[in-house]
Amino acid sequence: MAKKVKGNRVQVVLECAEHKESGLPGTSRYITTKNKKNTTTRLELKKYNPILKKMTLHKEIK
């Protein structure tokens, strides 16, 4: 039997902040992982938004 390992790495969803405010249909979301021990705050990364066709700020959502 495999033992359960309680890890610090969790999956998080990043959603485009600029697209959300624009009111256009659709959403740009990315899934990534982060280490809860090292990164206690919410992630904010610049990622490519294919709907707006440019690099935008993506924030972690719950």
Curated annotation (Swiss-Prot):
Keyword Ribosomal protein: yes
A GO cellular component annotation in the UniProt record: ribosome
Alphabetical list of InterPro entries matching this protein: Ribosomal_bL33, Ribosomal_bL33_sf, Ribosomal_zn-bd
Pfam families in the cross-refs: Ribosomal_L33
One of the record's GO molecular function terms: structural constituent of ribosome
GO biological process: translation
This protein's UniProt keywords: Ribonucleoprotein, Ribosomal protein
Family according to the record: Belongs to the bacterial ribosomal protein bL33 family.
Protein name in UniProt: Large ribosomal subunit protein bL33
Biological source species: Azobacteroides pseudotrichonymphae genomovar. CFP2
